[in-house]
Amino acid sequence: MSKILNTIWQYVRAFVLIYACLYAGIFIASLLPVTIPGSIIGMLILFVLLALQILPAQWVNPGCYLLIRYMALLFVPIGVGVMQYFDLLRAQFGPVVVSCAISTLVVFLVVSWSSQLVHGERKVVGQKGSKE
């Protein structure tokens, strides 16, 4: 019985922490003069808490594993919502495709530039440069 209660406690604690970060993000987003989704701010809060090890990762693991396991099911309402606006999407198909293609190209360029910046050639300390 105590093992069942312990498992239930772990799931409850995980979801309370995840939702606390979500609602903190929503509250902060309502105070900001710019429009940033509260869920994004909430994820950043959760990330900072985990990265600084203020919040132990094992406290949110059960809830995260459960959400990831059923992630495909969570996208069904979004798909239904998109299908409600199918006529609008069909009318704007060209601009949507061009926008996606350009944004993908921009992401490729930014990632390649930043990767080159981070992982580019560096001099090895103590090694003389070769003259060719």
Curated annotation (Swiss-Prot):
Belongs to the UPF0299 family. Keywords: Cell inner membrane, Cell membrane, Membrane, Transmembrane, Transmembrane helix. Disulfide bonds: none annotated. The lineage of its organism: Bacteria, Pseudomonadati, Pseudomonadota, Gammaproteobacteria, Enterobacterales. Its main location: membrane. This is UPF0299 membrane protein YohJ. The chain crosses the membrane at residues 8-28, 31-51, 63-83, 93-113. The keyword Heme does not apply. Pfam families: LrgA. The gene is yohJ. It is a multi-pass membrane protein. The keyword Acetylation does not apply. GO terms for cellular component: plasma membrane. It is found in: Cell inner membrane.
